[in-house]
């Protein structure tokens, strides 16, 4: 996620980091469907996403993920924390996190407001992530 969509934000340092991360994922996981950088509304609303896509691309093809995203990656911890708490509080979503990646094992920094069920959900999610990571190493 970004304040920019498909290059609309120019050469901002944060956008360049996001673009670099997207290219790295594409190189390391070519089967993964990933698109970006994009604003939240374009990521989850197909009509808005396609409108922006067609105004920024020379191609007649349509994106697969735009407007249909089921995973949202935030550019930093601040944005991620704000997003997940807003989704919980305003949208009625259940959050399993935050779960931080990039360490030897998943790490969670639970909110002081977490309930017992929140803690159990995060622990179960992290257990599954560790299991998947171990299977990938084998």
Predicted regions and their residues:
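Glycine-rich phosphate/nucleotide-binding loop
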Residues: 26-138
């Amino acid at each position: 996620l970004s304040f920019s969509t498909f290059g609309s934000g120019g050469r901002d340092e944060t956008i360049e980091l996001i673009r670099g991360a997207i290219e790295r994922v594409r190189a390391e996981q070519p089967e993964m469907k990933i698109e970006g950088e994009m604003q939240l509304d374009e990521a989850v609303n197909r009509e808005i996403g396609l409108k922006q896509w067609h105004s920024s691309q020379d191609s007649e093809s349509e994106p697969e993920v735009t407007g249909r995203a089921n995973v949202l990656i935030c550019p930093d911890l601040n944005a991620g924390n704000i997003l997940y708490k807003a989704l919980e509080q305003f949208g009625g979503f259940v959050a399993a996190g935050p779960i931080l990646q990039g360490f030897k094992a998943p790490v969670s920094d639970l909110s002081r407001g977490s309930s017992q069920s929140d803690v159990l959900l995060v622990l179960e999610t992290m257990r599954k992530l560790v299991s998947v990571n171990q299977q990938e190493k084998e």
